[in-house]
Each structure stands twice: as C-alpha cells, then as structure tokens.
From Swiss-Prot:
Function: Could be a mediator in iron transactions between iron acquisition and iron-requiring processes, such as synthesis and/or repair of Fe-S clusters in biosynthetic enzymes.
Cellular-component GO terms for this entry: cytosol
InterPro entries noted in UniProt: Fe_traffick_prot_YggX, Fe_traffick_prot_YggX_sf
SUPFAM superfamilies assigned: YggX-like (SSF111148)
Annotated GO biological process: cellular response to oxidative stress
Keyword Iron among UniProt keywords: yes
Classification via Pfam families: Iron_traffic
Domain of life: Bacteria
Protein name, per record: Probable Fe(2+)-trafficking protein
Length: 90
C-alpha cells in the first residue's frame, strides 16, 4: 500500500515518495511533504531550467540556483519560466 501524504505543492492527499530523493534534511522534508506527482512535475521543470539557462549541474552556482527554484516550486508560490522560453509544439 502506498504511503499517503498531504502534498505541500498540490494541497491534496496523494501518494508520497518511496524514499527521500537525496540525503539530509531537505531530502527528508521533501519525502514527508511532497507527492510523487509534484516531484515528477519538479523534475520536468528542473530539466527545462537546466536546458534554458544552460546550467552545468556539477557547478556550485547551478546547484544553488536549482535548490532555490526547487524550494520556490515545491513550498513557495512557484517559479517563473526563463525569459524567452517558448514551449515545444505538440
């Protein structure tokens, strides 16, 4: 049976993650308060941010930027898309 949580992002009861996404207090907070659906939404946005901003994830400044955006997306009011971003056509 899936673990159910009240998702901080979606504001609904939903399936929780199977394990913390990474070690430490931030990973534990996400594990306890973010649903699988919201985490998948974040991963899609993170990929877009990496591509649009041409980030190199192993650089400290890029990791810090992604950490701030993740916090805003999951627990704050959301993030904005990069300036000039045009979504792909279906």
């Amino acid at each position: 049976m899936a673990r159910r949580i009240i998702c901080a992002k979606l504001g609904i009861e939903a399936d929780g993650l199977d394990a913390p996404p990474f070690p430490g207090p931030q990973g534990q907070r996400i594990f306890e308060h973010v649903s699988k659906e919201a985490w998948q939404d974040w991963l899609k946005l993170q990929t877009m941010l990496i591509n649009e901003h041409r980030l190199t994830p192993f650089e400290a400044s890029a990791r810090k930027f992604l950490e701030q955006e993740r916090e805003k997306f999951l627990f704050g009011g959301g993030t904005s898309t990069p300036q000039g971003y045009v979504p792909p056509r279906s």
